[in-house]
């Protein structure tokens, strides 16, 4: 008689995409099992199927899924969730007409958060970040990428990474860090941005690489991200930083084309970046280059939504070109203070014209591939981590259909219940 550590039973409907990456029309592929059971051993799935198929299994612990809809735990591949302070005052200024670039030029925007983060200790960063991770987890995210990038000096960037590392060891959510020392040009280098590029290349990257070598939590390369945009880093500056990062063993990621198409997408593909993120202003010829690569296009629909913009990334064009599309929240204090992947899906269905099936796969299977965690998380299959979100919804279409509420009832990480949302407890 087969035996497991845990059996997750009474799943009303289990839905998962194939394993990553999913290109083009593959993004709409889902497998559904009604009245499903999942068997878990040492945190990984060892069997899944219908209740009839797994009726012989026993376990040390049985988890009643309450008849809920089961999906893979969301994987959020792009956040800036570690920071101090907030930018609620800028939200009101934007409503009154201030632009993103105007706020940046006046010392606000990213610089406002840099000032607050530089003044915070590691303990304060941990304390302020933890509730954001609680919210991400409560909304069904079981793995999240978190960037540094609000230090813009070597010491604070390392403090941010240390805070992220502490959270990775003390919070149930899975965390994948990214170094983003090239997030913006700090005020002290405004008149000499090349000197800041020198600092990133000659001091920050080697220091962070040395720090990473001492870590025991993660076994894969650290990623280096950069904001390739007017007012931040040019294509030439980005290339210089990324070439050095690649030589030091970093994986590469880029913020590109949020406002203008500088050429960051072709650069990313040329250098073998794992993802390019934003893509709001990406022209068709660059979408074609991206689609013909292993680089994931990560759409952040909460960001133009948060900025009150009407232009969103051309996600359908990337799908139709047979590219790899993922979704993320871009959780950050300024433009997308969103901690909900279901909300990102709801926006994507409306403004990016994704079907609910496409959006679900983009937020699980392909988002795991965007941070190269796809061999462990993002889909439900034998050998994968038992990371599930149980939703109080009749089927997967309702994830994009409903918005403004949290449909997640129970969150399971490596076979353990790590969150029960009280709102759904009396169902």
From Swiss-Prot:
One of its GO terms (cellular component) is cytoplasm. Zn(2+) binds at residues 78, 80, 255, 330. Its EC number is 3.5.2.7. It catalyses: 4-imidazolone-5-propanoate + H2O = N-formimidoyl-L-glutamate. 4-imidazolone-5-propanoate binds at residues 87, 150, 183, 258, 335. N-formimidoyl-L-glutamate binds at residues 150, 332, 334. Fe(3+) binds at residues 78, 80, 255, 330. Belongs to the metallo-dependent hydrolases superfamily. HutI family. One of its GO terms (molecular function) is imidazolonepropionase activity. Pathway: Amino-acid degradation; L-histidine degradation into L-glutamate; N-formimidoyl-L-glutamate from L-histidine: step 3/3. It is an enzyme of class 3 (hydrolase). Pfam families: Amidohydro_1 (PF01979). It is found in: Cytoplasm. Its cofactor is Zn(2+); Fe(3+). This is Imidazolonepropionase. Binds 1 zinc or iron ion per subunit. Disulfide bonds: none annotated. It comes from the Bacteria. It comes from Herpetosiphon aurantiacus (strain ATCC 23779 / DSM 785 / 114-95). NCBIfam families: hutI. CDD domains: Imidazolone-5PH (cd01296). Catalyzes the hydrolytic cleavage of the carbon-nitrogen bond in imidazolone-5-propanoate to yield N-formimidoyl-L-glutamate. It is the third step in the universal histidine degradation pathway. Keywords: Cytoplasm, Histidine metabolism, Hydrolase, Iron, Metal-binding, Zinc. GO terms for biological process: L-histidine catabolic process to glutamate and formamide; L-histidine catabolic process to glutamate and formate. InterPro entries: Amidohydro-rel, HutI, Metal-dep_hydrolase_composite, Metal_Hydrolase.
């Amino acid at each position: 008689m087969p035996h497991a550590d845990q059996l997750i039973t009474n799943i009303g409907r289990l839905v998962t995409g194939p394993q990553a990456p999913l290109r083009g029309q593959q993004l709409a592929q889902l497998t559904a099992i009604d009245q499903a059971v999942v068997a878990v051993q040492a945190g990984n799935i060892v069997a899944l199927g219908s209740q009839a198929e797994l009726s012989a299994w026993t376990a040390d612990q049985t988890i009643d899924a309450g008849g809920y809809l089961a999906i893979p735990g969301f994987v959020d591949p792009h956040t800036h969730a570690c920071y101090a302070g907030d930018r609620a005052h800028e939200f009101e200024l934007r409503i009154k007409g201030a632009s993103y670039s105007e706020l940046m030029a006046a010392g606000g925007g990213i610089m406002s958060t840099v000032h607050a983060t530089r003044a915070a200790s590691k303990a304060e960063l941990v304390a302020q970040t933890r509730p954001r991770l609680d919210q991400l987890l409560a909304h069904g995210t079981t793995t999240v990428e978190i960037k540094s990038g609000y230090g813009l000096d070597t010491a604070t960037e390392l403090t941010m990474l240390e805070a992220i590392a502490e959270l990775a060891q003390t919070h149930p959510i899975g965390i994948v860090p990214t170094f983003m020392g090239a997030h913006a040009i700090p005020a002290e280098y405004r008149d000499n941005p090349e000197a800041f590029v020198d600092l990133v290349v000659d001091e920050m990257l080697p220091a962070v690489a040395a720090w990473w070598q001492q870590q025991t939590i993660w076994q894969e390369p650290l990623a280096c991200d950069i904001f390739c945009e007017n007012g931040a880093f040019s294509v030439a500056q980005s290339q210089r930083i990324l070439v050095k990062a690649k030589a030091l063993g970093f994986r590469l990621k880029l913020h590109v084309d949020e406002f203008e198409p500088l050429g960051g997408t072709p650069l990313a593909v040329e250098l073998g970046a794992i993802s390019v993120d934003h893509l709001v202003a990406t022209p068709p010829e660059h979408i074609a280059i991206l689609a013909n690569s292993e680089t994931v296009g990560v759409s952040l629909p909460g960001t133009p939504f948060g900025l009150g913009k009407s232009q969103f990334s051309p996600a359908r064009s990337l799908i139709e070109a047979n590219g790899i599309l993922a979704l993320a929240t871009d959780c950050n204090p300024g433009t997308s203070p969103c901690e909900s992947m279901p909300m990102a899906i709801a926006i994507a269905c409306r403004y990016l014209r994704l079907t609910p099936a496409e959006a679900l796969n983009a937020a699980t299977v392909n988002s795991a591939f965007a941070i190269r965690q796809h061999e462990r998380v993002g889909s439900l299959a034998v050998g994968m981590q038992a990371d599930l979100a149980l939703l109080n919804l009749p089927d997967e279409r309702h994830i994009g259909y409903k918005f403004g509420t949290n449909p997640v009832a129970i969150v399971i990480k490596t076979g353990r219940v790590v969150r029960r949302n009280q709102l759904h407890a009396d169902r």
